[in-house]
Amino acid sequence: MATIQVSVITPDGAVYEGDAELVVVKTVEGELGIKAKHIPLVSPLAVGPARFIKEGKEEQVAVSSGFVEVRPDHVSILAEAAERPEQIDTERARKAKERAEQRLASEHVDRKRAEAALQRAITRMDVAKHKGA
């Protein structure tokens, strides 16, 4: 099957470079599946995992919003923050999830910010499960 080049880039530099038969990202409109020769597009990303599938194996990167740019031969994910599974401190992510849940349980809280923090923590915990996969 044909592959497409993939780059995940943050302000701190490249987090992932490789090729995949299928790239799946979470946009603000829903999940988007991308294969080689996809029509060009740019879309804002939501917090979630970026998944790269090749030869039946899947790699993931936790993405904290940004944009995806798709060209027929390349996918660029420009993210505010992104982490590979081996970079994620699961204990720190678990504590961040607990803090976000506590904030959401209180009355005087910026709900949108707390919900975003909760989603980031959950995404990081889910992606961390793919360490060594």
Curated annotation (Swiss-Prot):
Question: Which UniProt keywords are present, listed alphabetically?
Answer: ATP synthesis, Cell membrane, CF(1), Hydrogen ion transport, Ion transport, Membrane, Transport
Region of interest called Disordered, as start-end residue ranges on this chain = 81-110
Which InterPro entries does its entry note? Answer: ATP_F1_dsu/esu_C_sf, ATP_synth_F1_dsu/esu, ATP_synth_F1_dsu/esu_N, ATP_synth_F1_esu_C, ATPsynth_dsu/esu_N
Cell location: Cell membrane
Give the way it sits in the membrane.
Peripheral membrane protein
- Where it mainly occurs, coarsely classed, is membrane
Gene3D superfamilies named in the record: ATP synthase delta/epsilon subunit, C-terminal domain, F0F1 ATP synthase delta/epsilon subunit, N-terminal
Would the keyword Acetylation be found if you checked this record's keyword annotation?
no
> Which GO MF term does the entry hold, naming one?
ATP binding
Regarding protein family, the annotation reads: Belongs to the ATPase epsilon chain family.
UniProt cross-references to HAMAP family, sorted A to Z: ATP_synth_epsil_bac
Q: How does it assemble?
A: F-type ATPases have 2 components, CF(1) - the catalytic core - and CF(0) - the membrane proton channel. CF(1) has five subunits: alpha(3), beta(3), gamma(1), delta(1), epsilon(1). CF(0) has three main subunits: a, b and c.
What function is annotated for this protein? Produces ATP from ADP in the presence of a proton gradient across the membrane.
For this entry, the protein name equals ATP synthase epsilon chain
What gene, per UniProt, encodes this protein? atpC
